[in-house]
């Protein structure tokens, strides 16, 4: 098999110039009354969810689907046509062919994580708006380049943190911002569980239906084994950052939505890899983040919070006057020991979302700013990248939040 490596560093050097599409920034000016033409890159789990959500919108036309796995691609096209007989999507194995089309307004990206930034930046350069998947980027520097390119091209971007649009997230932010808990000094975030090792499976010839070289793309070359692909790719640092990278943005979102923390100075992460297989992301990870006036703790174990042992994923805010615990799965809040649906005395101050996909489409039409916009989610994703660097280096990292540089540690 021919071994390829697009080269992540070379891509980042080139992406400030024209990339593949720098001369093509001729954004389709879709009048608000017309349909938005959407293409989907990645048709697996979340890709399928986005195909369903967008194709259900009356002002959306699904014109293209793309996947390096031809079996998944054919199945997703069939499901779309069964649900919506009027749909006539063209199918592609290479997303760059989609970006050559002048009639496409929006590209969704639900690829493995190591492709997120590349697809988005190429789409920005081609004059497309983008609905992306979490995590925002594979690396901190890629996130910076994404924001630079988006700003230059004027593209609209929304990250697919659908829970951000929920009334409960808005309500928690209103309660915290109301001051009823006093000044918040500590926030605890958690998602129990971590990576498995997956044993030591033998390498295989990739299925004829999978373009393994294209799947790898900018990642280091590796021989194919099923565990590296599709649903379990995220347990390899070549492609993602494990459970931590998968869930950080969902839980950190309520922190950033509520408090907008600034002035990150130190990041200290500890953890352990499984050791019983080829996967190398943490089976557990604890991380401490020092922001200006705020300490944030992440763990993959139940935190020292009353009732948290029954919550696999959540957030806990500790204020001068009280505490608030958010259960991500049941979407309940707990003030002290009392489980509540709401605090009726706290006024509604934040506008409610029409739904995450709808919020994005409305921004595409108005050229406005969606809720999970790129500057917001990049700032939210940055601590995750630094924590993974701290974990892999096995030492605390000092961060200059003004220059956005690690202080005194070139290896980071």
Model-based region annotation:
Residues 46, 115, 137-138, 164-165, ...:
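Glycine-/small-residue-rich active-site loops that bind phosphorylated ligands and cofactors
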Residues 171, 183, 188, 195-334, ...:
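Contiguous beta-strand/loop segments that form the cofactor/metal-binding neighborhood of enzyme cores
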Residues 2-132, 141-156:
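N-terminal glycine-/serine-/threonine-rich beta1-alpha1-beta2 phosphate-ribose binding loop
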Residues 129-131, 137-214:
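A contiguous active-site-proximal alpha/beta segment in oxidoreductase catalytic domains
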Residues 37-40, 62-66, 108-109, 131-132, ...:
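Structural recognition of the beta-strand scaffold that forms the well-ordered cores
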Residues 55, 99, 150, 176, ...:
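Hydrophobic residues in alpha-helical segments
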Residues 57-59, 101, 178-181, 209, ...:
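Alpha-helix termination/capping residues and helix-transition junctions
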């Amino acid at each position: 098999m021919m071994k390829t490596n697009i080269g992540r560093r070379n891509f980042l050097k080139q992406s400030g110039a024209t990339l593949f599409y720098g001369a093509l920034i001729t954004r389709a000016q879709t009048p608000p009354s017309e349909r938005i033409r959407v293409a989907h890159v990645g048709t697996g789990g979340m890709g399928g969810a986005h195909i369903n959500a967008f194709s259900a919108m009356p002002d959306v036309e699904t014109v293209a689907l793309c996947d390096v796995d031809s079996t998944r691609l054919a199945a997703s096209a069939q499901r779309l046509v069964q649900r919506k007989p009027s749909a006539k999507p063209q199918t592609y194995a290479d997303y760059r062919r989609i970006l050559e089309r002048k009639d496409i307004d929006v590209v969704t990206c639900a690829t493995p994580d190591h492709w997120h930034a590349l697809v988005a930046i190429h789409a920005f350069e081609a004059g497309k708006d983008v609905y992306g998947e979490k995590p925002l980027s594979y690396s901190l520097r890629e996130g910076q380049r994404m924001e630079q390119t988006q700003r230059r091209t004027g593209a609209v971007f929304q990250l697919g943190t659908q829970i951000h649009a929920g009334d409960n997230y808005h309500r928690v932010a209103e309660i915290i911002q109301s001051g009823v808990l006093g000044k918040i000094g500590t926030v605890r975030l958690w998602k129990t569980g971590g990576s498995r090792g997956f044993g030591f499976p033998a390498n295989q010839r990739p299925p004829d239906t999978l373009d393994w070289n294209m799947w790898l793309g900018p990642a280091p070359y590796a021989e194919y084994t099923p565990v590296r692909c599709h649903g379990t790719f995220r347990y390899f640092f070549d492609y993602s950052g494990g459970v931590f990278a998968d869930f950080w943005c969902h839980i950190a979102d309520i922190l950033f939505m509520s408090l907008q923390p600034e002035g990150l100075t130190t990041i200290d992460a500890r953890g352990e890899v499984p050791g019983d297989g080829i996967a190398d992301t943490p089976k557990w990870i604890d991380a401490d983040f020092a922001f200006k006036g705020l300490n944030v703790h992440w763990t993959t174990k139940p935190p020292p919070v009353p009732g948290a042992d029954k919550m696999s994923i959540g957030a806990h805010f500790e204020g001068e006057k009280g505490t608030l615990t958010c259960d991500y799965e049941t979407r309940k809040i707990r003030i002290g020991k009392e489980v509540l649906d709401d605090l009726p005395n706290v006024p509604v101050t934040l506008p409610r979302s029409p739904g995450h996909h709808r919020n994005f489409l409305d921004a595409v039409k108005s050229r406005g700013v969606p809720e999970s916009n790129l500057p917001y989610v990049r700032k939210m994703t940055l601590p995750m990248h630094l924590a993974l660097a701290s974990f892999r280096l096995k030492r605390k990292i000092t961060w200059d939040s003004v220059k956005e540089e690690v202080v005194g540690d070139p290896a980071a």
